[in-house]
Amino acid sequence: LVNPDYVVIGEASGLNIKTGQRGRAEILLETFGKAAHSANPEKGVNAVKKMCRLISELDKLQPPVHEQLGKGIMEVTDIISSPYPGASVVPEYCRATLDRRLLTGETKESVLAPVKELIARLEKEDPQFSAKASFSVGKEKCYTDAEIQGERFFPGWYYDPKEDYIQKILG
């Protein structure tokens, strides 16, 4: 077992020392409705319309900012309804993925909290609104054929350029 004091990651940087990077999380949003024939939409609850409202409200949230790393961006990267394709059907389910760029000090709880608070507010305002937020789960196959899985949450990191480690590299 090796326990190194330091690690250097050889990533494209134009030979510049990078002392930090935003992390990344994939947030899974789900909205739930009630299927109906699209000729009688009043008999259903359109999960896509509920998702549109949720995304519109999420866009109003102010992401945290780090002096060196920038904004903790949150952007919709995909959206799909069910049934899909939904010929003549009011969709009863909708799923969207958010790409959330993470800053140092952010935790799983602190990232999901504002999203869950927003969902709770929308559910209170609209009795037909039903949604949940969680982290996407990634599944990967190892060289041994074993399958591993975990939440897609990769923290940001930052080292002060004045730290000994960085000064030794620059020296």
List each model region and its residues:
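Metal-dependent amide/peptide-bond hydrolase catalytic core
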Residues: 28-171
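Acidic/histidine-rich catalytic neighborhood of metal-dependent amide-processing enzymes
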Residues: 1-26
